Amino acid sequence: MSYVSEQLELLKKKNPGEPEFIQAATEVLTSLEPVIQANPQYEAAGILERIVEPERQIMFRVPWVDDNGKVQVNRGYRVQFNSAIGPYKGGLRLHPSVNLGIIKFLGFEQIFNCLLYT
């Protein structure tokens, strides 16, 4: 089994119920496979393990009062992947349909967005 395949299997085991994140990571790691295979030093340095694991995951409650005066409580999420090149990019998502897998997917994609513009 290749290094990329091993990491994808591990990712699926560690993140069950997060299909959006798994799909994004699978697409990126699969596209990187030729480069990873041609450069064994990346495996030795554990590059893929570090790319797919967030530095921080913050989950918090957001209480608010609706138009009828009733208190509602939503979950908020912030996932931060890599601070190596400076502050984290991203934001907060507070919509009730959002879950941790979606936020991890968005944060994961921001790694590469930041690298392109740095």
For the regions a language model picked out, list residue spans one by one.
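Extended active-site and interfacial segments that coordinate phosphate-rich ligands
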Residues: R78-E109
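Structured beta-strand/loop patches that form or line metal/cofactor-binding pockets in enzymes
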Residues: Q41-Q72
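Ordered core of a single globular domain
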Residues: E9, P16-L29
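Beta-strand scaffold of nucleotide-dependent catalytic cores
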Residues: V73-Y77
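Conserved small/polar residues in nucleotide/adenosyl-binding loops
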Residues: Y117-T118
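Charged, compositionally biased N-terminal leader segments and the immediate start
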Residues: M1-K13
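Generic secondary-structure signature for well-ordered alpha-helical cores
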Residues: K12-P16, T30-Q41, D67, F108-N113
